[in-house]
Amino acid sequence: MFKDLRSLFVATALLIMSAAAASAQDSAQDYPQWRGRNRDGAASGFTEPKAWPEKLTRRWKVEVGEGYATPIVVGKTVYAFTRRDGAETMTALDAATGKLIWRTEYPAPYKVIDAAAAHGAGPKATPLFHGGNLYTVGVSGAVSAFNAATGKLLWQKPAPAEHPVFGMAASPIGDKDLVILHPGSYGPLTAYDANTGAVRWAADGNGAYASPIIVELGGVRQIVTMTQKNVISVAVADGAPLWERPWKSAGTDSAITPIVYGETIIVASQRMPVTALKPTRRDGKWVVEVVWENKDVSLFMSNPALIGDTLFGLSEKSSGQFFGIDAKTGKTLWLGQPREASNTAVVKAGDLLFMLNDDAELIVSRGSQTGFEPVKRYTVADSATWAQPAISGNRVFVKDVTSLALWTLK
């Protein structure tokens, strides 16, 4: 019996060491957080094939639970944050085979309002891999830290009394020893100590659904995000307010992650024009200038992607219309056909765009300044696909209603 236990211990230790080592491997192909390595919707390490296959090859498919957090990929492991039997669940799978490495869950009761019933009870925020750990925000706002190699729950902050109407959707971001997020509908933007969960600073501004970014402007590292009433910026180091710009979306539905273009920040939300802001510091004070506004396009939940000087995405207007906008001037370069999709998740790779519609159609298109140029269309699931895909190398990880699947080009 002792020998059997020793063998089990050794096998478990080897598995944990293997998972830990995987975290340090293949970093060029890691997709470790919301919208990828740089939070800009870029794929990691994709190489365009000489000829596109007629169909993608599904390598594996695993039931992981509900929710539409993006799967993240680190080394040889893919992580999924989902809901299973009333619990929010963090699952680690072997990226090559789909085999379970570990699974950790905690009770997370949540009642879905009727308007969001079709989307389920979440979770919606994408996990963050940072410093060897995983950080999650549950649909009710519970903040959790897990050891990425073992799944051990390191610390957890319980859900606040109130959360956004449609549940938490803003994904956490990491910087050095901080994890930063909006913990709830009326919670301030908050920086937690990544190791202990202690609050390091909190900045005013009720949370919306958009995820924050970190950018350096005027020599100052700052966090830019959307609140329910403003576009705001605070210093990463201490949360000190830097600048803000009034911004009122329909309801509180600001769900689009800001995009950095040169010295400007491009922001958008439901029934609002796509807008480029230029924050500058003059005589010690920040001034925010509107560089351009584009009223031809409005963005609801589909985050766009920037390729060179062109912004591509899906407008909510005309019941879903692909577009290209000149990021320098805000001029509309082209608008696609109406009713192309009700929602799409956009990932860029070189001059290519991967557009995963919510009906499980994956469109590969060329980032053109003259019009919509589809290259191939693939079906990648048997149910709705609200989660953004993770593209790591030439692997496409797709989360549908309850399953996670790996698709490859051959």
Where are these regions (language model features)?
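Noncatalytic, solvent-exposed loop/strand surfaces
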Residues: 22-410
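Bacterial N-terminal signal peptides that target proteins for export
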Residues: 1-12
